[in-house]
């Protein structure tokens, strides 16, 4: 298996936009909990951690970039704790880990940071206002039904001048698998059902963070491309990650001939010269701060001492000197 990471300068297309997810019930959260429990209980569960390890380390890098010590932090939807293993107790002194999967919490990775586990849904955080200096999240928020509400809760539990640093998959994720399955079903069954869960578009994320109350926003995109022997191996690894579709309108079973046709289409349309096939994961990274009086603020309109009209005088001033 070959994993490569590269930055995206632009987004060519977006599959689904969910800026209005508030009040929607897209995902079966009980099913997602069972999927995560099953995946984390596998004897070889670490075999499927490669994507979470990569993204967790990149979230940790952004924590170090802030260059401050956080007395108390929260990891929302921590899974097996793939962020904390890349952090030190000199940066994060104490950590709360939350997840809907008790098995994930029991089988979490070790860290030198003193940690406390709380089984909790990302959509219902059981913490008081102004509790945490830092909130983290990596590859769990794309399964939340009410993403605007979850971001508001994160904002609420942060202390003033606290920071939220997160990562979630974006709308271009697994486009190869999505297209291959749709084309195969159209050909074999005369129509198609959704097999890949809907993801948030990068164009919506900044607006969602702003609406939740965050300021000094940063949103950037990475693309992680993993090469597999074939489409069936892509689907096997998604299951091992606990990342199978849990949308209420998912199709439970694929016909065998449709699956074989999709695998052939996948290899024909996207296959590499060595016979492998790529699977693309678009990762959206976000940083948002809870407002505080000490933070820098934009100058008031009209308060500048220099006008753009003065630029024409620069040459004259230089010649006078």
From Swiss-Prot:
Residues 1-25 form a transit peptide. It is found in: Mitochondrion inner membrane. One of its GO terms (molecular function) is S-adenosylmethionine-dependent methyltransferase activity. GO terms for cellular component: mitochondrial inner membrane; mitochondrion. Its main location: mitochondrion. Keywords: Membrane, Methyltransferase, Mitochondrion, Mitochondrion inner membrane, Oxidoreductase, Transferase, Transit peptide. Coiled coil: none annotated. CDD domains: AdoMet_MTases. The keyword Methyltransferase applies. Gene3D superfamilies: Vaccinia Virus protein VP39 (3.40.50.150). It comes from the Eukaryota. The keyword Oxidoreductase applies. Belongs to the methyltransferase superfamily. Interacts with NDUFS7. PANTHER family: ARGININE-HYDROXYLASE NDUFAF5, MITOCHONDRIAL. Arginine hydroxylase that mediates hydroxylation of 'Arg-111' of NDUFS7 and is involved in the assembly of mitochondrial NADH:ubiquinone oxidoreductase complex (complex I, MT-ND1) at early stages. May also have methyltransferase activity. This is Arginine-hydroxylase NDUFAF5, mitochondrial. It comes from Danio rerio (Zebrafish). The gene is ndufaf5.
């Amino acid at each position: 298996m070959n994993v490569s990471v590269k930055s995206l300068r632009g987004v060519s297309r977006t599959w689904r936009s969910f800026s209005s997810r508030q009040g929607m019930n897209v995902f079966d959260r009980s099913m997602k909990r069972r999927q995560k429990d099953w995946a984390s209980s596998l004897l070889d569960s670490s075999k499927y951690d490669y994507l979470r390890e990569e993204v967790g380390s990149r979230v940790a890098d952004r924590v170090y970039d802030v260059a401050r010590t956080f007395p108390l932090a929260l990891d929302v939807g921590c899974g097996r704790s793939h962020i904390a293993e890349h952090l030190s107790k000199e940066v994060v002194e104490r950590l709360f880990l939350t997840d809907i999967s008790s098995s994930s919490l029991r089988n979490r990775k070790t860290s030198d940071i003193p940690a406390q586990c709380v089984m909790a849904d990302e959509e219902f955080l059981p913490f008081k206002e102004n509790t945490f200096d830092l909130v983290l999240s990596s590859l769990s928020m794309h399964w939340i039904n009410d993403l605007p509400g979850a971001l508001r809760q994160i904002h609420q539990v942060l202390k003033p001048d606290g920071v939220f640093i997160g990562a979630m998959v974006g709308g271009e994720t697994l486009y190869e698998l999505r297209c291959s399955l749709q084309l195969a079903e159209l050909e074999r069954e005369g129509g198609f059902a959704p097999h890949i869960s809907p993801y948030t578009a990068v164009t919506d994320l900044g607006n969602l963070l702003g609406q939740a109350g965050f300021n000094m926003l940063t949103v950037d995109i990475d693309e992680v491309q993993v090469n597999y022997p074939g489409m069936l191996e892509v689907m096997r690894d998604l299951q091992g990650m606990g990342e199978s579709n849990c949308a209420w309108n998912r199709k439970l079973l694929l016909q065998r001939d449709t699956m074989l046709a999709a695998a052939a289409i996948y290899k024909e349309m996207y296959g590499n010269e060595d016979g492998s096939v790529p699977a693309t994961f678009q990762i959206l990274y976000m940083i948002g701060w809870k407002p505080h009086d000490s933070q820098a603020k934009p100058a008031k309109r009209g308060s500048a001492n220099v006008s753009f009209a003065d630029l024409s005088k620069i040459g004259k001033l230089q010649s006078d000197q």
